[in-house]
Amino acid sequence: MAMATIAAQIDNHDVRVADAVVWRSQAVPRFLKLLRDFKPDVVGFTSMTFQYDTTAGFAYLAKQFDRHIKTVLGGYHATLFSDAIATGQDVGLWDFILRGEGDFAFGEMLDSIEDGGKGMDKILGLSYKEEGLFRHNPARPLEDLTRIRIPARDKRLLKGFHMYFRQADVIETSRGCLHLCNFCSIREMYGRSFRLFPLERVLADIEDAYSRGARHIFCTDDNITLDMDRFEQLCEGVIRLKLKNLMFTTQASPIGFAHRPDIAKKMVKAGFVSIFLGIENGSTKNLRTMHKPNTLDTIQRGVEALQKEGIIVIAGIINGLPEDDPESMRENYQFIKNMGITSVMDQIMTPYPKTPMRDEMIEAERVANFTDFRWYDGYFSNVRTSQLSPEELNFVRWKIRREVIGMWRATPGDWKFFKGYTYLWEFFFRHVVWLNERLLELIFGIEGRYKLQMRQYMQLNNFGIEIPGRRRIESYHPVYGNHADPYKDTRWSLLKERLPFPWRKRLKGIPCKQ
């Protein structure tokens, strides 16, 4: 969405947008095909911290294809880590770095490139090269959201985004958050601010996505319920549009629904079927450690208000706080389960750059991985607690979730909005998955099953691009320790470990297929 929004603000250049996530295993050949077909002068990338290595790999491919291509990096990681990128080993991969919001800065940069670099030093938020060294222009003020046109969805080269088995799209109705959560990097991107897009613009954006086939829309707002009156107006506006068979999912804090439980009824009428709630933790002590404004009471009241209307609640929780141990993590999952929530997106506390939590954990000597950002995706541990090493934290979190939450079970909301798929899951696929899990656990053991699943997670951001000569400042792995081979465990190698000794000896010479 961010790239399509930037494209919509550019009038004087031919811009196309592609999302490499859709490609997965075919990412490299398809990217090279795009370069051959379009022969671009400039290739821009956006990246979260955990995606940076992959992004650098694509920039390398672009430079190898044509050394005259100008490469640009924007997004969260570029904003938070611009100094390190500008002086690090990847400096040769990037010609420009865009810090902060790029809605208009990208177009200004393109105009300057076309004009031979004239006025480059006047583009706020831009870092560019002079004689091979990066020069950082002053920071860019926050944009006036009333000036930003809706995303240019016609510029997308790739289709195939789905959610709940429906064609999906994304919108934003606001930017920023006023909360002071110390693990979050939003303040480094937007400051402590909360800005609203005009309601008319939001509704036009929804209609545009719908006209292009979207039947499920995800709202990407950082905290859409900071202004509950405005959120109510949004629901009323969507109801007036009368768009048939359109559903919504959003992310929010439970606080707003605890104070305004009545809005849940309008949400359902507008088409909101599910919501990702930043619950974060079931411990008052840990909520205070994270500087969360939530209390256990507001969390429970907010969840109850949504569940009463049949809205599916997806709980976002964080483990790996400084004093966490197996018992506190078990209590965290049990708190979620006791509220009747079966969809859980759990993460391990990640020390993102420029966050207060990172500084606090470094001072307390809790950070285990400072610079290998491949693992900064929430799935893997990059910290240690007072009770657990990074490897122990990773395994214990996985095991306790498996024991307490277990496999997903349908809630009343699932039966209400997705009855057919829910029947299929509850009466067929759930039993197949359960049997598969039991067999895998029987064959490989609990630790073997854990390693196989971690190996699957490793592939989520692995596009198979290697940059020759690129070195890592530190060698880190959250599952195997710092000096082990992260891909050594395959189904075959783990099976051999489980076999009785004579069979292991007999099979010793048989290679493990990678």
PLM region spans:
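Radical SAM [4Fe-4S] cluster-binding motif and immediate context
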Residues: 146-314, 319-321, 326-334
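A structural signal for short coil/turn segments at secondary-structure junctions
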Residues: 38, 66, 89, 212-213, ...
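Flexible glycine/acidic-rich beta-alpha junction loops that bind and position SAM and/or redox cofactors
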Residues: 81-82, 179, 229, 285-290, ...
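Radical SAM enzyme core and accessory elements
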Residues: 12, 32, 41, 93, ...
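Structural detector of well-ordered beta-strand residues that form the stable sheet scaffold
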Residues: 70-72, 98, 249, 276, ...
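Structural recognition of alpha->loop->beta junctions
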Residues: 84-104, 264-274, 331-346
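Short, solvent-exposed turn/loop segments enriched in Gly/Ser/Thr/Pro and often Arg
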Residues: 21, 48, 76-77, 220-227, ...
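Glycine-rich beta-alpha loop elements in corrinoid/cobalamin-binding modules
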Residues: 2, 6-141, 348, 354
